[in-house]
């Protein structure tokens, strides 16, 4: 972490098909070993499945799913006088999106469907309807913050 000046955030260009920055961020998180075209084909395939299953705009459903998974508050460890406290803190806007995307991908990988396209489509539909593994993850993070509300005065 530099001490002198703030480093400028890298500008992420919108994805070529849907012209959406959030879709581009998701593709960048989904890719493995730099294979972006494969990650794009997986996500676009999931969007095609969403269109068939949900009969709704896949990008709108995707954005709703990410918004439903975004955490508002999380806990951070803070060491005070020999003991470590889980201190609830508000999540920054960019980190909310990053966590939501990460949780959706990790929970999609754990699903029972056969292909990653089907897994992602299922996770998007579930998250958009406020159910599924990624929503459970957000709820557990919020519950942890609620349980440790007594330590909120230990600010960072």
Curated annotation (Swiss-Prot):
CDD domains from the UniProt entry: uS7_Bacteria (cd14869)
Disulfide cysteine pairs (residue numbers): none
Molecular function per GO: rRNA binding; structural constituent of ribosome; tRNA binding
GO CC annotations, alphabetized: small ribosomal subunit
Transmembrane segments: none
Pfam families: Ribosomal_S7
Gene Ontology biological process terms in this record: translation
Stored InterPro entries: Ribosomal_uS7 (IPR000235), Ribosomal_uS7_bac/org-type (IPR005717), Ribosomal_uS7_CS (IPR020606), Ribosomal_uS7_dom (IPR023798), Ribosomal_uS7_dom_sf (IPR036823)
Coiled-coil residues: none
Role, per record: One of the primary rRNA binding proteins, it binds directly to 16S rRNA where it nucleates assembly of the head domain of the 30S subunit. Is located at the subunit interface close to the decoding center, probably blocks exit of the E-site tRNA.
Cited HAMAP family: Ribosomal_uS7_B
Similarity comment: family membership: Belongs to the universal ribosomal protein uS7 family.
Quaternary assembly: Part of the 30S ribosomal subunit. Contacts proteins S9 and S11.
Annotated protein name in UniProt: Small ribosomal subunit protein uS7
Organism classification: Bacteria, Pseudomonadati, Thermodesulfobacteriota, Syntrophia, Syntrophales
């Amino acid at each position: 972490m530099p001490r002198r000046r703030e480093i400028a955030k890298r500008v992420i260009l919108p994805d070529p098909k849907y012209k959406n920055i959030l879709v581009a961020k998701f593709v960048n998180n989904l890719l493995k070993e730099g294979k972006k075209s494969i990650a794009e084909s997986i996500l676009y395939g999931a969007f095609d499945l969403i269109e068939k299953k949900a009969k709704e705009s896949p990008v709108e459903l995707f954005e709703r799913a990410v918004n439903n998974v975004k955490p508002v508050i999380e806990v951070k460890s803070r060491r005070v006088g020999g003991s470590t406290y889980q201190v609830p803190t508000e999540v920054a806007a960019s980190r909310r999106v990053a966590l939501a995307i990460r949780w959706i991908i990790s929970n999609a990988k754990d699903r029972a469907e056969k292909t990653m396209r089907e897994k992602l489509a299922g996770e998007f539909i579930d998250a958009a309807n406020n159910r599924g593994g990624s929503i459970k993850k957000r709820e557990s993070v919020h519950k942890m913050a609620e349980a440790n509300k007594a330590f909120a005065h230990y600010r960072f």
